[in-house]
Amino acid sequence: MSQHPDINSSIDANHLTDDQTSLDANAVIDKEAMPDDSKHIRIVNTFMKRRTHMNKNAELALTAPEFAHYLVNNSFGDGNLDGIDDLRALFADLPNGSDAPLTLEIGFGLGDSFIEMAAAEPSRNFVGVEVHEPGIGKCAYMAGTQNLSNIKIINGDAIQLLKQLPENHIDRIQLYFPDPWQKKRHYKRRFVSAERMAIVTRSLKQGGWFHTATDWEHYAFWMVEVLDGFAGLSNQAGAGNFTDRPDFRPMTKFERRGLERGHGVWDLIYLKD
């Protein structure tokens, strides 16, 4: 594990854009207790939908009936989350049932590591939420070709989904390599913020954990600052520390290539008290 110094002095200015200077009073996230009625917080999107190529396998998985059981809602366009208010119920008729440990991955990208984790823990149920159709399709295709029965995929905004779920519902929430929103004027879009973590922790079970990883140094320090100051979460590496990559989080090709070039990757695991 590693420890960071004060966030305002820890980041080499050479790694920042003109807009991405060290955090100042206007950029630091408010750490005051959030109101109980967090369901009514105005949401600023943490993602930007991009047009990307969809290969034939991904398109097949989004349209062919043999993959339909992986897709919880409409996988084209803006995902309609109406009625999705219990992730455990999605597995009621599957081998693991609804009482198995439950992991929610937010923004699984193309799904490679998500599928690898689900295959490695067949007794755990995995739900992935994503907004990009090519990634949703590829993930469903890989799940189908491996005949996995512990995966469900949702198209839509993760924050909106979390607001609809019961309290103390999920055992593990993971957020790997989220968009760092590098420009200072976009910091409000960063997923890890006091407002959004109030929604995330509400859905976590007591004793459950939030695991995040980033390869963007400034965002890493931002996250540890926010999360260490958030009541109800405990840094499993100790306050101010990052943890080594746990064995259960697969290393992606992109991550391995970055490490070979000397880029850093920072993991954080927080337990809900």
Curated annotation (Swiss-Prot):
Methyltransferase as UniProt keyword: yes
Active site: D179
Protein residues bound to substrate: K183, D215, T252, K253, F254, E255
Superkingdom of source: Bacteria
SUPFAM superfamilies: S-adenosyl-L-methionine-dependent methyltransferases
GO molecular function, one term: tRNA (guanine(46)-N7)-methyltransferase activity
Pfam family name, one: Methyltransf_4
Family according to the record: Belongs to the class I-like SAM-binding methyltransferase superfamily. TrmB family.
NCBIfam families registered for this protein in UniProt: tRNA (guanosine(46)-N7)-methyltransferase TrmB
Name of this chain's protein: tRNA (guanine-N(7)-)-methyltransferase
Biological source species: Psychrobacter arcticus (strain DSM 17307 / VKM B-2377 / 273-4)
Gene: trmB
